């Protein structure tokens, strides 16, 4: 069985960032879709998912949080680990479930969606909640792996901190 990704290991987290906020969102990671053109003009189909993400972020901050965690001018660094949902062929008998994952499967496999679109969706969802604007993000490490925990339905781990560079 593949190993779990350790977010605190030296190969994932650099010494120049000390994490102050983290979030784990269950479910298959969502990429940033491209804007679409419809009868009524241009629209962004990610609006609903973005609102759900912002609600999850606000819930972790608690009711006492007012304003953004990192105001304008504060450089931010972060780590995003996207654990992608496994396909049915990765499970014994083609039936997903806990303890049904085949042995010796790779943790990393080049699959859709693109890692940059996964990161863009998360960065945009954190706008106005964790930081004022995602232009404050000066360092970002993104890892896309296949989930190997439980039923392998996917999850996203996000850690954000002030960047000391």
In which residue ranges do the predicted regions lie?
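Acidic, proline/glycine-enriched N-terminal capping motif
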Residues: 2-165
């Amino acid at each position: 069985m593949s190993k779990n990704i350790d977010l605190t290991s030296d190969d994932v987290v650099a010494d120049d960032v000390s994490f102050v906020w983290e979030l784990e969102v269950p479910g298959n990671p969502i990429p940033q879709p491209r804007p679409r053109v419809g009868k009524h003009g241009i629209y962004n189909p990610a609006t609903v998912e973005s609102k759900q993400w912002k609600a999850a972020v606000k819930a972790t901050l608690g009711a006492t949080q007012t304003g953004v965690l990192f105001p304008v001018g504060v450089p931010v660094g972060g780590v995003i680990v996207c654990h992608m949902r496994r396909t049915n062929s990765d499970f014994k008998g083609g039936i997903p479930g806990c303890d049904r994952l085949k042995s010796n499967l790779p943790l990393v496999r080049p699959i859709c969606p693109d890692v940059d679109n996964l990161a863009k969706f998360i960065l945009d969802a954190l706008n106005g909640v964790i930081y004022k604007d995602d232009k404050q993000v000066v360092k970002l490490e993104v890892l896309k792996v296949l989930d190997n925990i439980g039923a392998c339905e996917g999850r996203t781990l996000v850690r954000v901190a002030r960047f000391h560079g």
